[in-house]
């Protein structure tokens, strides 16, 4: 399947903030963000299947954002150390201004107790790439060593529930 990645023209932080003020929980906020992303692209690409996805991280009722620098990544890893956190995912497909598929799931991730030396070495290896991930770790790289246990779909941890998505695309005869 050929595809094109198009950045959505939305203010994620503002949408997240507004939805939280409205009293919505992580699942609803993730869905609102995924829908807003897909909708912003779908408006410019009618008759096209547009996939929007979002992932939130919640630990002990605290919502995390992507770290903005290595120092904030360090602080985030210190807060996640030894804790179980949730990755809350939502993926939405829009075609012709209509949501035709939605999928949500939550993954529980337990992090090892991390000492400052391990965090420092990890950040030195990964560099600013950790700022692309809400958890400041990349499971597909050295970040796997930080985790004690994962309960959930591997692809969803990476940000896209690939197997359910492929199932939908096959059911719609888009994949053969």
Spans of features found by a protein language model:
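Mobile beta-alpha loop/short-helix "lid" or hinge segments that flank ligand
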Residues: 2-13, 90-98, 132-144
């Amino acid at each position: 399947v050929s595809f094109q990645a198009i950045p959505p023209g939305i203010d994620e932080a503002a949408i997240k903030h507004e939805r939280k003020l409205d009293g919505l929980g992580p699942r609803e906020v993730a869905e609102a963000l995924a829908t807003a992303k897909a909708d912003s692209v779908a408006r410019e690409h009618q008759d096209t299947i547009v996939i929007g996805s979002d992932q939130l991280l919640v630990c002990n009722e605290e919502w995390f954002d992507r770290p903005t620098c290595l120092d904030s990544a360090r602080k985030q890893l210190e807060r996640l150390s030894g804790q179980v956190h949730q990755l809350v995912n939502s993926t939405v497909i829009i075609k012709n201004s209509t949501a035709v598929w939605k999928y949500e799931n939550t993954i529980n991730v337990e992090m090892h107790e991390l000492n400052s030396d391990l965090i420092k070495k990890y950040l030195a290896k990964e560099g600013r790439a950790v700022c692309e991930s809400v958890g400041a770790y990349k499971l597909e790289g050295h970040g796997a060593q930080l985790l004690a246990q994962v309960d959930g779909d591997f692809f969803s941890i990476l940000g896209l529930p690939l197997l359910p998505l492929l199932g939908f695309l096959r059911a719609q005869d888009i994949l053969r």
